[in-house]
Amino acid sequence: MSAMTGLFAHGPTPLANTLDFPGDPGILGPDSVSWRVLGDASVFVGGIRALVIQSAHAEVVAGVEDQSTYRSDPLGRLSRTSVYVTETTYGAMPEVEAAVQVVRRAHRPVHGTSERNLPYSAGRPEMAAWVHNVLTDSFLAAYQAFGPARLSAVDADRFVAEQTRIVRLLGADPLPETSDELTAWIANHPDRVVTN
C-alpha cells in the first residue's frame, strides 16, 4: 500500500470526489473484470511491459521523447497515467469524463515528426490505439502470469471489451474486442518497428 501512496504523492489524488456521486458505478462497475485485474499488484509489471512494447512504434517514441516530462519528472508522469487508469476504471462517470478530458488536453499539443520523417500526433486515433491496446494487452498478460488466478477466456475477452469501452471516449481506433484479436493486432501492426 505504501507504494501506491508514494506513487500518488507525485500528482493529483484519484477518486477524490467519488463519494459525491452515490450509486454511480462509473463506466464499468464493481462486477467488471477490470476492477479485479487493475486492483492487483501485477499491473505494475504490466505497466513496465507496456512501456517496452510501446517503444516499438517510432512515432509514439518520438512524441514521448519530444513532448513528455518523463525524463525530468518520471514519477509525476507515472502518477498522471496511474490517476487516469484509476479514475477511468473505478471512478463515477463525472470522474471518468474528467479524466478523459485531462488526457485530451494533454495530448492536443503533442505533434511533430519522427526520426523516420513521419508525422505524429497524440490525437491521431491510430496512435492512441497503439498505446491503449498495448497497455490493455500488457495488463492482461501480467495478470495471467502473476495474478492470483488466471482469467478464463471469457473473462479475458470481457477485460479487453471493458477497456475498449473506456478508450473509445478518447477516440482511439481501431480497438480489438477480444483477447485473441488484441494479440494479433499488436503482433501484426504495420507501424511497429522490428529490428533483428
Kindly label every feature range from the protein language model.
Residues 1-130, 136-196:
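Mature, function-bearing regions of proteins
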